[in-house]
């Protein structure tokens, strides 16, 4: 198990990753991450056909001052593509109103391969193309836990 944290408020632009500054890293080398970045590498080191990881993000998100009031969301992305089933949506009523969101995904990495993952600010309004997402959100108390489950 590995845990990655970032307690300070950070502005995250649309389609960009949340950055993680502190870590309790994996001691077996299954997960690679440099503090201060938002990209993680999961390794398919296994005697089986695949390695499986459970990735869970928890954090507080808000629209910064000056932003438009729209639904906001984060999602876990794999190889640069958001897993929309992991999308966590919050709809604030005013700017600077934080909401706690949690997102989880099971990620299967084939033997001998490596997958990159990140937690990204994604468009929460994909169902309504007339709504324009706010360009940035604030993220605070970001916490990412990665467990190797198989």
Predicted regions: what they are:
Residues 1-150:
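Extracellular jelly-roll beta-sandwich "head" domains, especially the C-terminal globular C1q domain
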